[in-house]
C-alpha cells in the first residue's frame, strides 16, 4: 500500500527503508509539513504518516477523507496535534507509537538537568573560546535533593527510578493513575500540589490534555520553592511560557531546561539562523543564562527511530488486515 510521510527528514529514510523490508509498502517522503494547504500532496495515499508539528485539524482530515485516506499514523507518542473527534467523524483511524523508546527520553531528561545544574553547556562554549574561568558555573549536588515527577508512565517512571536509585534523591511523584510498583523503589506518591511545593527539581512527563494544559502557570509557580529548576521533555503546552518567563525574571524559578515549547511548530526542525525570530516570548526565554532549550530531540536515538519506523509500518499493515493492536489506536 502507499504510505506518504510528511515532515520527513533525512534521518527518517534509513529506518523506514530498513523496516519496510518486512512490510513492502510503497513509501513517499515529503520534507514539508501536513496542513490544509499541503494536504492535496498526499495524493492517492492509503496511509498518511505525520509527526509532532503537522497540523491535522478538521479541515485537513476532511480533505484526507475525501481522497480516500482511512488511516493517519503518527510516528510519535503524543497526538495533541490531531483533531481526534473530527477523525472519528470522517471515519479515519488514528494510530500512534505509544512506547518507542522510553529510555531515549528519560536519559535525555536526566542529561538536561545535569547540564543545566552544572552549567556544562556554558562551560563548553567558554573553553571553545579559550576562556577557562569557572566563575559563574557553580552548581549544586543533586544527591539528597527532592525531585518531583509529574506523570509516571514509562518515561516518568524511568526518570523517577534514575534519580532515586542512581543519585540518592528523594523522589515525589504524582499521576492520576499511579504506578504503585514505583513504591518498591522508594518513590513516594503524593498529591500534585505537594510535588509542586517540595520539589527542588521538577520534571514533567504527562501528556497534553485539557486538564494538563498550562499545568505550570502563575498560580502553580507561586506554590513552588523559590529557585526551583523545571525540566520539560513532554509537551510544550504543559507550560504557560509567559508565566514561566516572569517567574525566571523574578527569581522564583532558578532554572529551566526544555526540549519542547508551546509555539514550537513555527520554530523547531527548521534552520532559522538567517532569519529574525518574531516570537518575542521565546526570544526572551532563551536569552536567560539559566535556561537551556533544545529543539524536541529527546526521542532522537537510533533505537527510537528504528522502533518508530517498525511500529508505524506494522500498524499500517495490521489496519488493512483488521488485526490492529488496540494499544496503538488514539481515537478508540
From Swiss-Prot:
GO cellular component: cytosol; nucleus
Residues annotated to bind NAD(+): 154-155, 233-235, 259, 296-299
Keyword Transferase annotated: no
Keywords, comma-separated and alphabetical: Cytoplasm, NAD, Nucleus, Oxidoreductase
Name by which UniProt lists this protein: 2-hydroxyacid dehydrogenase homolog 2
Lineage top rank: taxon: Eukaryota
Record-stated family: Belongs to the D-isomer specific 2-hydroxyacid dehydrogenase family.
Pfam families named in the record: 2-Hacid_dh, 2-Hacid_dh_C
Subcellular location(s) of the protein: Cytoplasm; Nucleus
Record EC number: 1.1.1.-
Molecular functions (GO terms): NAD binding; oxidoreductase activity, acting on the CH-OH group of donors, NAD or NADP as acceptor
SUPFAM superfamilies: Formate/glycerate dehydrogenase catalytic domain-like (SSF52283), NAD(P)-binding Rossmann-fold domains (SSF51735)
Active site per database record: 235, 264, 296 (proton donor)
Source species taxonomy: Eukaryota, Fungi, Dikarya, Ascomycota, Taphrinomycotina
Amino acid at each position: 500500500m502507499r504510505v506518504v510521510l510528511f515532515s520527513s527528514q533525512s534521518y527518517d529514510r534509513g529506518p523506514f527503508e530498513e523496516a519496510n523490508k518486512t512490510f513492502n509498502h510503497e513509501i513517499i517522503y515529503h520534507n514539508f509539513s501536513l496542513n490544509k494547504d499541503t494536504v492535496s500532496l498526499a495524493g492517492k495515499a492509503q496511509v498518511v504518516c505525520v509527526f509532532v508539528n503537522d497540523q491535522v485539524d478538521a479541515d485537513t482530515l476532511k480533505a484526507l477523507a475525501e481522497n480516500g485516506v482511512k488511516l493517519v499514523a503518527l510516528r510519535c507518542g503524543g497526538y495533541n496535534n490531531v483533531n481526534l473527534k473530527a477523525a472519528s467523524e470522517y471515519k479515519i483511524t488514528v494510530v500512534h507509537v505509544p512506547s518507542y523508546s522510553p529510555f531515549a527520553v528519560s536519559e535525555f531528561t536526566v542529561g538536561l538537568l545535569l547540564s543545566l545544574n552544572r552549567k556544562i553547556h556554558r562551560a563548553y562554549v567558554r573553553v571553545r573560546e579559550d576562556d577557562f574561568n569557572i566563575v559563574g558555573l557553580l552548581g549544586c549536588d543533586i544527591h539528597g535533593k527532592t525531585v518531583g515527577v509529574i506523570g509516571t508512565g514509562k518515561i516518568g517512571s524511568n526518570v523517577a527510578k534514575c534519580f532515586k536509585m542512581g543519585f540518592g534523591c528523594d523522589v515525589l511523584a504524582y499521576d492520576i493513575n499511579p504506578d504503585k510498583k514505583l513504591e518498591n523503589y522508594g518513590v513516594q506518591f503524593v498529591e500534585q500540589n505537594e510535588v509542586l511545593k517540595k520539589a527542588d527539581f521538577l520534571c514533567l512527563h504527562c501528556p497534553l490534555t485539557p486538564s494538563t494544559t498550562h499545568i505550570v502557570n502563575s498560580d502553580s509557580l507561586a506554590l513552588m520553592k523559590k529557585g526551583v529548576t523545571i525540566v520539560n521533555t513532554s509537551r510544550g503546552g504543559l507550560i504557560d511560557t509567559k508565566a514561566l518567563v516572569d517567574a525566571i525574571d523574578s527569581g522564583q524559578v532558578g532554572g529551566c531546561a526544555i526540549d519542547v515549547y508551546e509555539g514550537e511548530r513555527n520554530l523547531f526542525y527548521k534552520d532559522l539562523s538567517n532569519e529574525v525570530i518574531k516570537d518575542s516570548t521565546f526570544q526572551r526565554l532563551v536569552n536567560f543564562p539559566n535556561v537551556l532549550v533544545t529543539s524536541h530531540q529527546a526521542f532522537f536515538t537510533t533505537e527510537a527511530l528504528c522502533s518508530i519506523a517498525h511500529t508505524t509500518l506494522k500498524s499500517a499493515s495490521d489496519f488493512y488486515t483488521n488485526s490492529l493492536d488496540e494499544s496503538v489506536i488514539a481515537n478508540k
